[in-house]
């Protein structure tokens, strides 16, 4: 009986998909170099990054949707993030970047030395 229970637990653990981690931020963030406090108006042609649970969408770029694979804290407000994506040309691609929380309304995504300054949307 004990062997059956252990076997059932092992099979269940192996059959359960790995759960992706959530991003360290959530909501809609617009591209902005402004230092103004508070959320900004994100209407118009502004680039929008939307973090929702373990998914991220980007209104500008070749890959519209990403799924988070891992989040590693590398400091008090810095994170190393790995996302997965699929599009017409790439299957199971990965995107690696760092995310820095400046304050509750400002973050910076840095991928391959290119910084994208974002501010929370209203």
Walk through the language-model features, giving the residues of each.
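Hydrophobic/aromatic beta-strand elements that line small-molecule binding cavities or substrate pockets
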Residues: 46-49, 67-72, 94-101
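A short, amphipathic edge element
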Residues: 60-68
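Beta-sheet ligand-binding and adhesion/scaffold domains
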Residues: 35, 78-122
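Hydrophobic helical h-region of N-terminal Sec-dependent signal peptides
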Residues: 5-15
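Sec/Tat signal peptide C-region and signal peptidase I cleavage site
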Residues: 16-20
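Short, hydrophobic/aromatic-rich segments at coil-to-beta transitions
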Residues: 26-28, 52-56, 75-82, 104-107
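Short, solvent-exposed loop/hinge segments that bridge or flank secondary-structure elements
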Residues: 23-59, 90-94
